[in-house]
């Protein structure tokens, strides 16, 4: 049974109904419809914390999806799941792939910065200040990208950049 039919949440049900109506009336190919259905089911599973099911749906959505913009959001969501699972190397890979297809995805840049900053903090705890600085410099670059796209957002990152002398 498609996930859209088992959601218990009123908003999720309403969104699913609207999405199904749009799929019927907007001219789309069968591949686009299939990709969207898997993507929608992946988002639903992800919102419920069912990450394995969400990943399965996202990977299935990637098969028929050819639009780079749409693929970027699938890749971004896969990155989110890997981040949640503590798989930071995989997460960075998926965020990077998302940005390759859609460079106007500030949340991917922000998440990459957060991971790099975290790794910098880990390096400090391990006593390696040189490695920490390299991670912090990389975090700064990703945050600058995110801020350039959405100047009013990421205030904490802007403050960190200013405090550490990395804001230009």
Curated annotation (Swiss-Prot):
SUPFAM superfamilies: TPR-like. Pfam families: TPR_1 (PF00515). It is found in: Plastid, Chloroplast thylakoid membrane. Keywords: Chloroplast, Membrane, Photosynthesis, Plastid, Repeat, Thylakoid, TPR repeat. GO terms for cellular component: chloroplast thylakoid membrane. It is a peripheral membrane protein. The keyword Ribosomal protein does not apply. SMART domains: TPR (SM00028). One of its GO terms (biological process) is photosynthesis. It comes from the Eukaryota. TPR repeats lie at residues 35-68, 72-105, 120-153. Essential for the assembly of the photosystem I (PSI) complex. May act as a chaperone-like factor to guide the assembly of the PSI subunits. HAMAP family: Ycf3 (MF_00439). Belongs to the Ycf3 family. This is Photosystem I assembly protein Ycf3. It comes from Nuphar advena.
């Amino acid at each position: 049974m498609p996930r859209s039919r088992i959601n218990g949440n009123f908003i999720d049900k309403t969104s699913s109904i609207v999405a199904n109506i749009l799929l019927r009336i907007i001219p789309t190919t069968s591949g686009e419809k299939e990709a969207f259905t898997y993507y929608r089911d992946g988002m639903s599973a992800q919102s419920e914390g069912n990450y394995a099911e969400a990943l399965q749906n996202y990977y299935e959505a990637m098969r028929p999806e050819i639009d780079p913009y749409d693929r970027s959001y699938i890749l971004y969501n896969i990155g989110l799941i890997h981040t949640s699972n503590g798989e930071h190397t995989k997460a960075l890979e998926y965020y990077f792939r998302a940005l390759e297809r859609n460079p106007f995805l500030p949340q991917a840049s922000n998440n990459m910065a957060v991971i790099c900053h975290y790794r910098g903090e880990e390096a400090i705890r391990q006593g390696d200040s040189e490695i920490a600085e390299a991670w912090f410099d990389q975090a700064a670059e990703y945050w600058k990208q995110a801020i350039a796209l959405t100047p009013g957002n990421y205030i904490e990152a802007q403050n960190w950049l200013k405090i550490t002398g990395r804001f230009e």
